[in-house]
Amino acid sequence: MIVRKYIYGDFNTDEAVEWAIKNCPSFEKYMIVELGWEEKQEIDCWFRFDVYFNDEKDATFYSLMWI
């Protein structure tokens, strides 16, 4: 299961990953993805933060905290 967040302003990805590691046993990995040019223009954002979990409950818990 993937939780996606567009990165705006001062969102702290390091803190978000540390929280996932400590609180979500099924945390698998994370990726910071640079958006394509059209998507950048459409939503005025350059990067997306993807966090991967093996369990839907952890993904939901993480979403409630960070999204």
Task: Please provide the spans of the model-predicted regions.
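Structured alpha/beta or helical-core interaction and ligand-binding surfaces enriched in interleaved
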Residues: 1-46
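Short, compact, well-ordered microdomains
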Residues: 45-67
